[in-house]
Amino acid sequence: MLRATAPCWFPPGYPEAKKVAEEAALEASRHLGGEQSQAGAPEGSKMLRATAPCWFRPGYPEAKKVAKEAAPEASRHLGAEQSPAGAPEGSKMLRATAPCWFPPGYPEAKKVAEEAALEAPEFPLPSHQPAQSFGLWVPQMHKQASAFVDIQAEPQNRGPAVPPAWPKMVTESCYFPAQRGSACRLPAAPRLTERPSGVRISAPRKRKTIAHSSSPCLVTGYTDAKRTRVASSSQRSRGSKVGRQPGKTRNRSGMACKTTATTSSKRIVRRASLPSLSLKKPIILRSSGCQVPTVLRRGYLQLFTEECLKFCASKQEAEEKALNEEKVAYDCSPNKNRYLNVVLNTLKRLKGLTPSSMPGLSRAALYSRLQEFLLTQDQLKENGYPFPHPERPGGAVLFTGQGKGPGDSSCRVCCRCGTEYLVSSSGRCVRDQLCYYHWGRVRSSQVAGGRVSQYTCCAAAPGSVGCQVAKQHVRDGRKESLDGFVETFKKELSRDAYPGIYALDCEMCYTTHGLELTRVTVVDADMRVVYDTFVKPDNEIVDYNTRFSGVTEADVAKTSITLPQVQAILLSFFSAQTILIGHSLESDLLALKLIHSTVVDTAVLFPHYLGFPYKRSLRNLAADYLAQIIQDSQDGHNSSEDASACLQLVMWKVRQRAQIQPRHRSASPAALACP
């Protein structure tokens, strides 16, 4: 038997294999002849020769020859037992395994396979194919398809290869049943809508990664259970004995999973914070081409609103006043620096206001107190206030020396440099001449050895060449054009009403016919701007006078309001009994072409120490009496700022006269007027 299997000991095609097989066949024939051969045939030889094709490697020429010789013997041997119809079953079986004799793709294999397919039995028979293992040729059993080959792709393995039967470890039998039992008692976890992350937050600004487990449901459920039990135990008792702690998650090696335990115990629960109860900020929309940042405007608007809430009756009123104050500051500020200067002064003013509904506050009482500060008829005439013309309707008359030019009507005198120049009938300069002038005033100061006079703009001596240059000469012209004036009239008032108290300020520019109105602002006794608008002059503008007026070409270009429209609006506000407050108010009334005699002039109320005709500037008065700095921008004056400063100066005078000190630091000018 051992020698019969000798062909398997040699590699395919080895010459010694055939010799050993033949010798083994004779011995096998003698040994098996008497027991298994009923017909007396050498059964051992037949069986060995029938398997001869397996002795050779696929495609070896001798294999086919031996197979053909073995086929008739196998047919005779198996015909009587397995083939009732007498078919050569041995030949069929051998030829059915013929494709295994040749290497894959060998041309002869396909032909033999097609012939064998017709004679192959219905049940699959084992076939043999050589396989190389450790240098020996070992036959390997497999099943051969009859006509088609099915190809199945192996599943993609994303992890290390795991044997189909993982050996059960001792730790699994110890810890896994307990985990499965606790997991079965836990409630089902909510289904996540997003892919769960492998990162847990253990402490602020620290992250720890949890290792992936083969049973994520068990690990997740157990971790959540531990989280719940720890929280409940900490809330039940504080300072009591520590009870039984839940077991930590174990891994396959039997060690506790420190990452999971640490993460669950130090996990920080995020909670939604409640919105703070703060004041809702008023909205300021962004505007294109704005030099003042919107964020800066919103910040100061919030500050204005907070201050207005202290003295306004309602939140809506406070927001409206804050929006109005911020809008006025923004409209009169062409750049950021000017805006900051204006809003800071406005904020100071708002901090000094108190509610207008305070006990003892009466506008009628304030009106009666201001009666003693009104200008008399002589003061009005002396300071150049206009009076109605006795003969010409719409005309005005001045009782001071009116500006008289040279004898020639086409000759004018420049109000800035004092040079005479010629003009045409339209008021334009006949010749283009540059104007050199000093925009500052002449001031005398005490120095060592005496007093020295110099200009405030450049510190130059009087009579020196001007430090500024203009394209052409200009003139005032207000005292020469005294037509188109309107006069305030008396109005019937109710018993509880009073005529009103307003502060007024105007800005002007130079035209071909002199100074004309370009902006007017009216402020009431509560420091509220009730009217503020730009005005389009009637004649051509030659110099916008931006250094003092703060009005630019863009401001005038976007307005269509004319002087007659402004006069109509002011007549609806004012009456003959209304008190108007201003600094050198005669210049404003001349620009408005308005005749009004109930006025309080701060230039007269706070006289210059040298007496008339000298007058103190509004800037110096505000600095001395109000501790405020105004008109400190190179972009020009602010009419609302000047009007408010005049009103505060008058209230300061009322308080001083009544010798009443304010009870609170944040007292309004109107409240300070009452005892």
From Swiss-Prot:
Cellular component aspect of the GO annotation: cytoplasm; nucleus
Q: What is its EC number?
A: 3.1.-.-
Its annotated compartments are: Cytoplasm; Nucleus
- Segments of this protein annotated with the region GOR1-125 epitope: 358-483
Which of UniProt's keywords are assigned here? Cytoplasm, Exonuclease, Hydrolase, Nuclease, Nucleus
Q: Per the database entry, which stretches of residues form a coiled coil?
A: none
Give the superkingdom in one word.
Eukaryota
Nuclease among keywords: yes
Q: Where is the composition biased (Basic and acidic residues)?
A: 66-79
Q: Which residues cross the membrane?
A: none
What Gene Ontology molecular-function terms does this entry list? exonuclease activity; nucleic acid binding
GO biological process annotations for this chain's record? rRNA 3'-end processing
The keyword Nucleus is annotated on this UniProt entry: yes
Query: Segment Disordered: which positions?
Result: 66-90, 225-263
Kindly give the Gene3D superfamilies that the UniProt entry links to this protein.
Ribonuclease H-like superfamily/Ribonuclease H
* Sequence similarity: Belongs to the REXO1/REXO3 family.
Q: What is this protein called?
A: Putative exonuclease GOR
Q: Which organism does this sequence originate in?
A: Homo sapiens (Human)
Organism taxonomic ancestry? Eukaryota, Metazoa, Chordata, Craniata, Vertebrata
Name of the gene: REXO1L1P
